[in-house]
Amino acid sequence: MTRLPLLLHSPRFAAALTTPPPPPLPPARRLVAAAAGGDLSLAMSAATGEYPVPVSPPYPAASKDVELRRAMTASARSAAYSSAPVVFEDEWLAVVDKPAGVYCDALLSALPCSAATLGDEATKPNLHLANRLDRDTSGLMVITKCNKVAGKLVKAFTEHKVKKTYLALCIGYPPAWEKIKICSGHGRSKHGAWRVYAMSDVGRSLPGGSVVRDMSTRFEVLGINGKGQFREPSNFEVDETESITVQEKAADLTSDGDEKNSIILVRAYPQSGRTHQIRLHCQYLGFPIRGDVKYSGVIEWNGVDYDGHALHAESLSFVHPVTGLPVTFRSPLPSWANEFISTMA
């Protein structure tokens, strides 16, 4: 049976681990990461004190072909993309709903700017992306219309003053907790792959001249295998949740046999803004996002091949950079979330 990750955790979380372990993963089609020569050299470098060793697995070799196919499809789709759904728009910014499988930059040319532009109506606004989403992630993005507003809002995102929530549909081990906060390191390994690192490695040098940086995410379980309750985003504080500090290698997600798997709907509250942060933490916790081939997610489930991962930028809350008023925006739920919620008892 696959062993759960070894973690530094709070006493209550330790008690939760004394419960009977969940069944191993099912025989769903999943791209398995084999040990790569690059990671062996990383381990050797770490042994000499040069580089830290990642605690999450490398990209599966077969994911390269899947990612290339998805990228080609997204490029064609982005080139033809002509109308971005607008959730909100005023003189200074627009909040749009990005579909999955479209690159962020396509939204700039697809934004149907209203008459509410700065200055002369004949002057085209200077559009900027205030935030970005991965190609296959759907949900809310903010587009600013002038340099001054762009600078203020980008700074707000960089300084983590924008509150964000995401929904993710995962396939893996059902967690024993309802809410949790996970803290780890984050960085690129020798061949450029984003990986999870131990918190004790934060600040250490990595190949390519970068360093391990800290990242933290709060998770809330909304449903497991059709049981649970979909609810509004929580405003919970740190002391209300269990806390995990990553120090050890993640569990091996491969398994044999006919064991069943769990379908898990989680809401993520990223506390930092690292690349692929939610995807990496879901992988480490043992329930990778469905369709996320880079990070151990199944590419086929219940007879269906998925062309992207099930991750959605659900909400954004921030102080308007011009009016100074607090604003909150919500995105309509994606079809995969509605389908799961409809099965919840």
From Swiss-Prot:
**Biological process (GO) annotations?**
enzyme-directed rRNA pseudouridine synthesis
- Give UniProt keywords alphabetically: Isomerase, RNA-binding
Give the positions the UniProt entry annotates as the active site.
134
- Reaction catalysis annotation: a uridine in RNA = a pseudouridine in RNA
Q: Which Gene3D superfamilies match?
A: Pseudouridine synthase
- A Pfam family annotated for this chain is PseudoU_synth_2
UniProt keyword annotation of Transit peptide present: no
Q: Which GO terms describe its molecular function?
A: pseudouridine synthase activity; RNA binding
The record's section on PROSITE patterns has: PSI_RLU
**Where does the UniProt annotation place the signal sequence?**
none
Q: Which family does it belong to?
A: Belongs to the pseudouridine synthase RluA family.
Q: What is this protein called?
A: RNA pseudouridine synthase 1
